[in-house]
Amino acid sequence: MNPEFWQARWKEKRIGFNQPKVNPLLIKYFSDLKMATGSRIFIPLCGKSIDMIWLANQGFDMVGVELVESAVQEFFAENNISYTIKAHDKNSNIKCYQGQLSGQTIALWVADIFMLRTNDVGRVDAVYDRAALIAMPAELRPQYSQQVIDLSQNAHQLLLTLNYDQNERAGPPFSISHEQIQQYYSAHYQIQELEGKPSTLNAAPEMTVTENVWLLNKP
């Protein structure tokens, strides 16, 4: 990952990927994961996503990871959630912000996701990936997808991706083809496409984009 790129995006408020409302595809399809109340959801590259507020209000705990500390600070400040900060036991550059909302625990690691270990993240019952895989350049995606599988101990995933002509725009967000989904995940999951719908990019509204929703279940 390129820390300087993402630090600059947040500092300059070029965060069109941060949605002001809960993602309607999360609301529509989260129940397909069949998670019991109290389950713990892992959200990679979580930013300050308001989706986490919705998940807490549905009765789920969360653990997230975000490279940019100011994004995590803004999440807690903008939602009036008190928090504590826990230092990492071995890496002084990693810390965890933790707070409570609607009786649910939200623990957000400030870290490069590739630096985290399974015991840092703890128990994971499902993964919600809305903006992480599509933020990764092609050369990092195999490593990223395997890292999430390892950190979550092969938990089910609800995955949102975009598919468009990558020649028209460099990204991020990057285009992910059906073939690439198979490449990254078929060794570990049964893959089901729940929806593919026309969508747009804030930075390029004239482009033809398909937003895909994937359910990744353990065999």
Curated annotation (Swiss-Prot):
Binding residues for S-adenosyl-L-methionine: 10, 45, 66, 130
What GO cellular component is one of the record's annotations?
A: cytoplasm
- Where, subcellularly, is it found? Cytoplasm
- Chief place of localization: cytoplasm
Listed InterPro entries: SAM-dependent_MTases_sf, Thiopur_S-MeTfrase_Se/Te_detox, Thiopurine_S-MeTrfase, TPMT
Carries keyword Thylakoid?
no
What catalytic reaction does the record list? S-adenosyl-L-methionine + a thiopurine = S-adenosyl-L-homocysteine + a thiopurine S-methylether
GO BP term (any one): response to metal ion
**What Enzyme Commission number(s) does the record list for this chain?**
2.1.1.67
| Gene Ontology terms for molecular function | thiopurine S-methyltransferase activity
The UniProt keywords, alphabetically, are: Cytoplasm, Methyltransferase, S-adenosyl-L-methionine, Transferase
Task: Supply the PANTHER family for this chain.
Answer: THIOPURINE S-METHYLTRANSFERASE
Its family remark reads: Belongs to the class I-like SAM-binding methyltransferase superfamily. TPMT family.
Q: What is this protein called?
A: Thiopurine S-methyltransferase
What's the source species for this entry? Answer: Psychrobacter cryohalolentis (strain ATCC BAA-1226 / DSM 17306 / VKM B-2378 / K5)
